Amino acid sequence: SSLFINYKGRKMLIDCGEGTQIAMKKYNCGFKAIDLILITHLHGDHIIGLIGLLQTMGNSGKTDDLTIVGPVGIIDAMNAIKVLVEYLPYRVYVIENPKEKFSLEHDILKDIEISTIDLEHSTECIGYSLYFKRKAKFDRQKAMSNEVPQILWKKLQEQDTVIYNDKTYYSSMVLGDERKGIKLSFITDTRPTFEI
């Protein structure tokens, strides 16, 4: 099993069972821009596709870092995979059994807050919630009432501050109220638990 997520051109996977890369090829998902793989547990139907996928990612020209997150045992699993996959042209960071909310430092993925929950399964198993933060929408009236030059409108939607003609302009001068984010939870292979 596997869930593929495309967020602003960057890609993530939750689990990587056998056949994951075949399905990804079939639907033209691409391999180069995968930045994050979240593993729920170490049963074969959730991790066995990782060996081939890591090699395919390297063969596709990936050089950006990859982060793999998983339950207790993911570090040992990755060490075993390193024996089979001797060379990768990108760095792999492994986070084992995270308990606190976290975000990645990647320019785009830093907008995603990830939290975990322990699940009830025959082995260590993690459920994931991804909270996709959303920026406030552009407010034309606000920009005009704050006398922000139109040439800066786009920049202030992307940057917090812009200095123009010796005057400082802030994104809050052109943006409306904060928007509620989008939450995606992936809970699999568990008995019913109160925490869910």
Feature locations, PLM:
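Conserved beta-strand hairpin/beta-sheet module of binuclear metal-dependent hydrolase folds
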Residues: S1-Y27, D65, Y128-L130, E178-I187
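Short acidic-hydrophobic surface loop/beta-edge motif
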Residues: I5, K101-L109, V162
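Active-site metal-binding motif and surrounding structural segment of the metallo-beta-lactamase
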Residues: G19-V69, Y93-K101
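Binuclear metal-ion centers of metallo-dependent hydrolases, dominated by the metallo-beta-lactamase
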Residues: K99-S103, F194-I196
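Active-site-proximal loop/helix segment associated with metal-binding centers of metalloenzymes
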Residues: L109-E195
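Active-site metal-binding loops of divalent metal-dependent hydrolases
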Residues: E18-G19, L42, G73, A143, ...
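Alpha-helical elements of the RecA-like P-loop NTPase motor core of helicases
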Residues: I22, I48-I51, D76-N79, I126, ...
